[in-house]
Amino acid sequence: MGRKWANIKEKKASKDKTNSRIYAKFGIEIYVAAKSGDPDPHANQKLRFVIERAKTYNVPKHIIDRAIEKAKGTGDETYSELRYEGFGPNGSMIIVDALTNNVNRTASDVRAAYSKNGGNMGVSGSVAYMFDNTAIFGVEGKDADELLELLMEVDIDVRDILDEDGQAIIYAEPEDFHKVQEGLKAAGIEEFTVAEIEMIPQNDIQLSGEDLEKFEKLIDALEDLEDVQKVYHNVELED
């Protein structure tokens, strides 16, 4: 297992600077998920996944409901899911996931963010092979041993369960996200501090001085882009 969730949180904290930005990004993601299938989350697994994620970020119910209602309308606004891979200073690797209604605009914006901040865009696959796509759940009130026993009782295998930062973190295969979540809910666990599918780096690197400063500016520039939903990287950031 690469970087633990305790370290990943430090990366995520830089992205989640304002509630308004979180809500806006989830609003689009929920709209797209609802528009691409049934607007009922019980009948749309993708929509249900996004809503569960939104709840861990305390996205208000009216934001979720508004996005779903918009998807029920007659508008035909089309969004594309895009992934960009690239490099920052001194061996740092970055993956950018975007959701956009204008592919050319997003590609140009991402490319400019890289070039203006000392980074370089890579080709598809140039970085992703150094990351593991992983389902992650955070549960408070139970330790790793208790969760392992619960999951064994419902015959669900996971990659690992670790006690981290006052909570138990479950790492599972991404395709098992819903199975693990439903198994936990069947065992009486309804609330999650984390419910994500993340790209976890297989190995972390540390940056310092000017390299770290350049890297942080690059990440900020990417995360500030309207169409960017998630940014993953392999740099270990301090608390």
Swiss-Prot record:
Keyword line: Cytoplasm, DNA-binding, Transcription, Transcription regulation
Keyword Zinc-finger: no
GO molecular function: DNA binding
Family annotation (InterPro entries): Integrase-like_N, TACO1_YebC-like_2nd/3rd_dom, TACO1_YebC_N, Transcrip_reg_TACO1-like, Transcrip_reg_TACO1-like_dom3, Transcrip_reg_TACO1_YeeN, YebC-like
GO cellular component, one term: cytosol
Subcellular location: Cytoplasm
Gene Ontology biological-process annotations: regulation of DNA-templated transcription
Family: Belongs to the TACO1 family. YeeN subfamily.
Protein name, per record: Probable transcriptional regulatory protein LMOf2365_0385
Organism of this sequence: Listeria monocytogenes serotype 4b (strain F2365)
